[in-house]
Amino acid sequence: MGETNTAAQPSQEFEKVLADSSTDVASFDAHDKTLLQKLQHFLHSSPAAVPLIVLVLSLIAFGVILGGKFFSAFTMTLILQQVAIVGIVGAAQTLVILTAGIDLSVGAIMVLSSVIMGQFTFRYGFPPALSVICGLGVGALCGYINGTLVARMKLPPFIVTLGMWQIVLASNFLYSANETIRAQDISANASILQFFGQNFRIGNAVFTYGVVVMVLLVCLLWYVLNRTAWGRYVYAVGDDPEAAKLAGVNVTRMLISIYTLSGLICALAGWALIGRIGSVSPTAGQFANIESITAVVIGGISLFGGRGSIMGMLFGALIVGVFSLGLRLMGTDPQWTYLLIGLLIIIAVAIDQWIRKVAA
């Protein structure tokens, strides 16, 4: 009995101490964030907010200045048609830039793919549908080569894609002999090549299938990037590749898949380009690489990787389209468009640097 009482005594003392102890939970001083800090955090968590705000404000501004001439179904759909190609190529560029890379070859891959589609049909007599598949395959192959050089040989994306840009551009001119395939010939013998240039009406609005594929592509990639493991890996690789590797992500395979998909999307843009201009021209789309980077940067996607929304890229492309058409309707010198777009690019990068302080 004495041993039992001795054993129970420490237990009773522990219960007494526990009963007398404070039940307050440890707390830290709460510092209210300033309005500026709240804004900073909001923009960090919603990267597409800034381009959306700029887009809405620019629409309102040109609407007030131009009135009904700007706010018409025809004008709004014309803006969409103008940015369809940039939006598709911008989607390809977005994937690469999210990994902290850059692809200067997107425009050249787009044009080469369109030339392959045209030349295989009219030079070799391939069925147009098979020529389209071959063009898509060439685009994916170019992207695969880019990805392999970046991921396996550890070469800088800027250097790799700069070299690929020159190689593909030269190959394009050498292979096509700078020959343009006329729109009339395509329409008569291979109308599928012009498919994305066909249009349909909804009320007074005229849409092309190129616009439809751009919107569907952006929505699909938004879902993939935000709702799938592959999409999360894209952001992880761009944010910190070493941490992603430690977390079990195969960074090499991811980079190759991203660049390959980017090349495939560029080839899709090449198909849409034929529909847009009607013909197959080796000189078309010369500035697509710069225009795609512009849409991505204005769209709030960080050039340092790991942050941004593909919806922001679409808003960025629309901002460029709104400014271009709005200033043209005002009768201003076209150089003002480039000046304002240049300012927007610098401001967008400055805002990105400011927002990145939150993560730091």
Curated annotation (Swiss-Prot):
Induction: Induced by fructose. It is a multi-pass membrane protein. Keywords: Cell inner membrane, Cell membrane, Membrane, Sugar transport, Transmembrane, Transmembrane helix, Transport. The chain crosses the membrane at residues 48-68, 84-106, 125-145, 155-175, 205-225, 254-274, 284-304, 310-330, 335-355. It is found in: Cell inner membrane. Its main location: membrane. InterPro entries: ABC_transp_permease. Belongs to the binding-protein-dependent transport system permease family. This is Fructose import permease protein FrcC.
